[in-house]
């Protein structure tokens, strides 16, 4: 049985924080919905979140600006993250990318769909792929209108040296089905397929393995949505039943709870269940992303953490006021408090007493 409904988020390692914010808010045209920090390790790094108008799972791109260490792109990684764009808008995106002098590969086609691949300043790769069946609401900017805005994810392209065992993992452990082959690309879809439900394995038999550690210019993991904490526990049981016993404990990521495992091809796959209140559980839905928010177990370290982070500026266009498409509702704070209380001691997270030894700023 599959507990996966589609993508939840994708997490990448970028370079500078301000460079990353400018790229996603101006070039990609996403709404910055959260600035927090990496919850693991002794170094203070931002964890930045971007999304469509409604901050919904399946549109959320998250990044760790990681200037300290460069990553090594290669096989065993997400090689490209794919967004959907409205049918007929790929020409706009080619012109838009040219206007910002963003490197791209021109208009291409795979599985009968037009797309354009483009690059982040740190070298990360993205696809904007035409999709007529996506009803999600994109974030509108001064340059990107509703008929061209990115809606959310189509899915990911994963680079693997061998296909067979990774294919088995996605089918048996996650419930995907194989729906097509186009050259060295093997397409898998969950449920009805289409937007937010597509994974493509790119067979790269001679490509050296990429790095697995945090490092600028590489993808860290892809996260799939399992809906509820109950399903998350069942997915962990399924992994272990199938022999994937290196699955992590259930972790508290504040905005969601999750487990991690590496598939046979090397890609880190997270399964996630959104926490009560989602990405608006700790700030005004109309002003998401404007302040540094820390989980309760890091608050006592706030001044220390802030001193280690690069100063950043969020564009005023990030405000939801005046955006009719941004319909994220106010959150029941009492329900969030109750959920936080219930989660205490139930999920794993780093102890607040651990010392930070550095960050991107020093």
What are these regions (language model features)?
Residues 2-74, 87-103:
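Active-site-proximal cofactor/substrate-binding loop regions of enzyme domains
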Residues 18-28, 32, 99, 134-137, ...:
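Extended intrinsically disordered, low-complexity coil regions enriched in Ser, Thr, Gly, Ala
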Residues 20-25, 48, 97, 123, ...:
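Conserved active-site tyrosine of GNAT-family acetyltransferases
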Residues 62-68, 139-142, 203-208:
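Short amphipathic beta-strand starts and helix->beta connectors
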């Amino acid at each position: 049985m599959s507990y996966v409904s589609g993508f939840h988020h994708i997490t990448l390692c970028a370079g500078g924080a301000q460079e990353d914010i400018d790229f996603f808010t101006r070039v990609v045209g996403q709404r910055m919905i959260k600035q927090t920090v990496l919850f693991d390790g002794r170094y203070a790094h931002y964890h930045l979140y971007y999304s469509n108008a409604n901050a919904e799972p399946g549109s959320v791109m998250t990044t760790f600006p990681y200037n300290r260490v460069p990553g090594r792109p290669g096989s065993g990684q997400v090689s490209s993250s794919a967004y959907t764009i409205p049918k007929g808008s790929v020409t706009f995106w080619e012109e838009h990318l040219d206007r910002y002098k963003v490197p791209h590969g021109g208009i291409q086609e795979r599985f009968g769909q037009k797309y354009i691949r483009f690059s982040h300043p740190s070298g990360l790769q993205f696809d904007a792929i035409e999709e007529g069946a996506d009803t999600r609401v994109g974030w509108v900017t001064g340059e990107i209108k509703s008929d061209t805005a990115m809606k959310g994810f189509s899915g990911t392209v994963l680079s693997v040296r061998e296909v067979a065992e990774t294919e088995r993992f996605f089918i048996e452990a996650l419930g995907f089905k194989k729906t097509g082959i186009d050259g060295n690309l093997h397409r898998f879809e969950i449920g009805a397929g289409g937007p937010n439900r597509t994974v493509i394995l790119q067979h790269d038999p001679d490509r050296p393995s990429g790095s697995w550690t945090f490092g600028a210019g590489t993808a860290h993991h892809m996260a799939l949505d399992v809906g509820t904490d109950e399903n998350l526990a069942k997915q962990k049981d399924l992994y272990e039943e199938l022999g994937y016993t290196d699955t992590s404990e259930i972790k508290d990521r504040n905005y969601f709870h999750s487990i991690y495992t590496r598939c046979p091809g090397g890609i880190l796959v997270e399964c996630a269940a959104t926490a009560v209140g989602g990405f608006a559980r700790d700030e005004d839905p109309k002003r998401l992303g404007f302040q540094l928010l820390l989980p309760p177990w890091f608050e006592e370290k706030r001044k220390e953490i802030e001193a280690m982070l690069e100063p950043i500026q969020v564009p005023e266009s990030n405000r939801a006021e005046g955006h009719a498409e941004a319909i994220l509702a106010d959150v029941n704070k009492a329900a969030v408090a109750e959920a936080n209380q219930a989660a205490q001691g139930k999920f794993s997270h780093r102890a607040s007493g651990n010392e930070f030894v550095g960050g991107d700023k020093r």
